[in-house]
Amino acid sequence: TGRLGKHDVVLVQSGVGKVMSAMSVAVLADHFEVDALINTGSAGAVAPELKIGDVVVASRLVYHDVDLTAFGYDYGQMSMQPLYFESDPSFVETFEKVLAQASIDSKIGLIATGDSFIAGQDKIDAIKGHFPEVLAVEMEGAAIAQAAQSVKKPFIVVRAMSDTAAHDANITFDEFIIQAGKQSAAILVEFLKELA
């Protein structure tokens, strides 16, 4: 805990995957009574125009590994939840402004979440078969969004691209994860400066 500019902040390293990230949201909401949740980190680029180091701001998030279609839900939709989790629009707008001011290549759109590290075109094609507009894939965002929605907290998920999920993702991930983390942290600091 501490202050960043005029904001009280609590930094948490959630760990990898949907369960760990959702648990972090519960702790932040219950123990620290935070007003909002901002999640940053890395992701694998799916959109061909994205390069390592580019940033994706999730306007919405979806699970790419949930299948309750046998019960009448859309593919990716968790029971009694929306298919897509919508980020706070004012947060999206503020991140868009910060990224433009910093001249960082970025996109705003859909991020897909699942408990698998996506490496290989066949896996990307399967995800894009359900969600053609997906920009990036990662392992926490939609769970954070669902948990934030459950505790009625505004949220945003922002990812720096650490790899291009199609080929040798595991190799590029190891090389560029530090760079992606630094990029995400710098953007977050600028975002907090812009908040009223």
Which role does the model predict for each range below?
Residues 41, 139-151, 183-185, 189-192:
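Conserved catalytic block of serine-dependent lipid acyl chemistry
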